[in-house]
Amino acid sequence: MSIRPEEISAILKEQIERYQSEVEVSNVGSVIYVGDGIARVYGLQGAMAGELLEFTGGTFGMVLNLEEDNVGAVLLGEYNHIKEGDVVKATGRIMEVPAGSAMLGRVVNALGQPIDGKGPINTTAFRPLEKVAHGVVTRQPVTTPMQTGLKAIDSMVPIGRGQRELIIGDRQIGKTAIALDSIINQREKKDLICIYVAVGQKQASIAGIAAKFEEMGAMDYTIIVAATASEPAPLLYMAPYAGVAMAEEFMEAEGKDVLIIYDDLSKHAVAYREMSLLLRRPPGREAYPGDVFYLHSRLLERACRLNPDHGGGSITALPIIETQAGDVSAYIPTNVISITDGQIYLEADMFNAGQRPAVNAGLSVSRVGGSAQTKAMKSVAGQLRLDLAQYRELAAFAQFGSDLDKATLARLTRGERVTEILKQGQYQPMPVQEQVVSIYSGVNGYLDDIPRDKVGEFEVDFLKFMRSANADVLNAIKDTGKIDDATEQKLIKAINEFKSTFAV
């Protein structure tokens, strides 16, 4: 058999033409230090701030410091197997979290991974952790109410959709309870998506909250983002941004209204301080880094109400801050107070005296919520604030004098009754029309002759009576959002009719 050279050359040419080379270019570096949840990596040219890095063993990290000869990264998982000299690969991707309707009813960690044992989450929507907040042109003013179901708040510190309202107070005085009641109150309409971000809380507490939401039927429209106390600081730092990224998917892509709760931003700031000090950033006041204000302002500025041209959705943010011994002039509390559109101040003395929710009406304020309040609530809330202010002023003097004139006694009596009316149990949010008739009966003096210890009982029975015999009055307030003359006359008649049957 003779081999012809031209055949061999033809075969070789064909093989060469068919050959395809695939060159994969990776940006790689090596670990020069690892420990305390952070790593320093040498040789990553062109790394971006916030970029995702892949370490050996599948652990991911996020770039936070870009320095002259290395990058500082925080590690998002187990790092005991990572050692000096290990290869690190830059992914070229910014940190993202899954989003969309598939997340509803689930408990996820700060990376958006499910931790509730209900299987994987199937979603194609992803959102970047960091995003520039919407500008002035795309926003519109706050005009729609966000009902919390709590009389003390919906009347005196009203919250509108798209607002940022701070809940501030000492530990264990009902801050989280207000936030949870606000979520549970949405179960009737279910037109508000709720996201509860737990930062640095006990796992048992989060399990309890999830169980309560399931029991109350609130989990259908809620996502819980949990970064527990046992998790590394980077995950605690990321959790609020993950929550607001999920909220933006609903607001921008679907035009929906979202309520997001950050519980709490004090622990968030502490986690950021820990990371910053480990990354050797210069410390400032209370050892917080210089950009701790920006940490919270860029988060809370992402809450807004979009105009109809951009979908008309909204994000309402309720950040929580824990104070030490009522000190609202500390660093983090003053920062967040200046960023938000008002604050609900909870007082330990009121809580211990049995006034729950312990909202201090004098120190609490809502800067933009007033324009979102319904006319019916506005008509009773003005008198309510006045009655409480006069009562607080007189109650201090009444402790010293026994012989008070009739006008002073009448004001004290009215204040006591109104204070009783504002009491409300946990997990018992109330529809706005029932709140209005309760407060109306208090501020217009119909409870002045009811003993103080019977006011709560009177209110419960009176609302049952209104639901059964005077549902038309409640429906009129609900549908029109105001109390017209005809409705008011019916309401007065109903109050007097019930009072005649109420056994004191």
UniProtKB/Swiss-Prot annotation:
Pfam families: ATP-synt_ab, ATP-synt_ab_C, ATP-synt_ab_N. It is an enzyme of class 7 (translocase). One of its GO terms (molecular function) is ADP binding. Keywords: ATP synthesis, ATP-binding, Cell membrane, CF(1), Hydrogen ion transport, Ion transport, Membrane, Nucleotide-binding, Translocase, Transport. It is found in: Cell membrane. InterPro entries: ATP_synth_asu-like_sf (IPR023366), ATP_synth_asu_C (IPR000793), ATP_synth_asu_C_sf (IPR038376), ATP_synth_F1_a_nt-bd_dom (IPR033732), ATP_synth_F1_asu (IPR005294), ATPase_a/bsu_AS (IPR020003), ATPase_F1/V1/A1_a/bsu_N (IPR004100), ATPase_F1/V1/A1_a/bsu_N_sf (IPR036121). It is a peripheral membrane protein. GO terms for cellular component: plasma membrane; proton-transporting ATP synthase complex. ATP binds at residues 169-176. The keyword rRNA-binding does not apply. It catalyses: ATP + H2O + 4 H(+)(in) = ADP + phosphate + 5 H(+)(out). Disulfide bonds: none annotated. Produces ATP from ADP in the presence of a proton gradient across the membrane. The alpha chain is a regulatory subunit. Belongs to the ATPase alpha/beta chains family. F-type ATPases have 2 components, CF(1) - the catalytic core - and CF(0) - the membrane proton channel. CF(1) has five subunits: alpha(3), beta(3), gamma(1), delta(1), epsilon(1). CF(0) has three main subunits: a(1), b(2) and c(9-12). The alpha and beta chains form an alternating ring which encloses part of the gamma chain. CF(1) is attached to CF(0) by a central stalk formed by the gamma and epsilon chains, while a peripheral stalk is formed by the delta and b chains. This is ATP synthase subunit alpha. The lineage of its organism: Bacteria, Bacillati, Bacillota, Clostridia, Eubacteriales.
